[in-house]
Amino acid sequence: MALAAPLHELAEQAAALGTRIAIETMPFSAISTVPMGAEIVTAAAHPAAGLLVDAWHVFRAGTSLDQLRTALRPEMIFGVELDDAAPEVIGTLFEDTVDRRLFCGEGVFDLIGLVQVLRDLGFDGPWGVEILSTSYRVLPVDQALKQAADTALTVL
């Protein structure tokens, strides 16, 4: 587990400064799934090392809710980002993640199931909405914020 030692070292530094380090997995990166990230966090063996769980990254990596349930412990989840997407990747995975995300409930991700799994595990940390989308970038900020909050509440 080559990344565990550097993560442990970063977590030590973060803890000394009163903060923590979270890995966010990406299906097109060296740490491509949440279960893979959980293995690295477990091997790093430091309470200041954890994961940021992003719905887009979970579902586009093909990770099942059962795999999440098996891989995660509540103390390793530092935050969750909610978002949705179309049934098929639009463009490359990178283009899909930075330009084509949808508000919660507007796509095909099982966000209610994801939220339930994380709650069943005991996660009680912060929930956020991460909508990276060319179509939403043109919205007035107050409208985008309201739509993000309103749609997120439908799955929380």
Regions inferred by a protein language model and the residue ranges of each:
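A general structural signal for short secondary-structure boundary/capping elements
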Residues: 101, 126-130, 149-153
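Soluble or luminal CAZymes and related metallo-dependent hydrolases
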Residues: 2-6, 32, 106-110, 144-147
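A structural motif corresponding to the C-terminal end of an alpha-helix
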Residues: 9-21, 113-124, 155-156
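Gly/Pro-rich active-site loop or hairpin
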Residues: 34-38, 42, 57-124, 133, ...
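Active-site acidic/histidine proton-transfer and metal-coordination neighborhood
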Residues: 1-50
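Short strand-turn motif at the edge of the Rossmann-like AdoMet-binding core
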Residues: 25-26, 56, 131-132
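Hydrophobic faces of well-ordered beta-strands that scaffold small-molecule active sites
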Residues: 21-23, 49-53, 78-82, 125-129
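C-terminal helical cap(s) of enzyme catalytic domains, especially alpha/beta-barrels
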Residues: 138-156
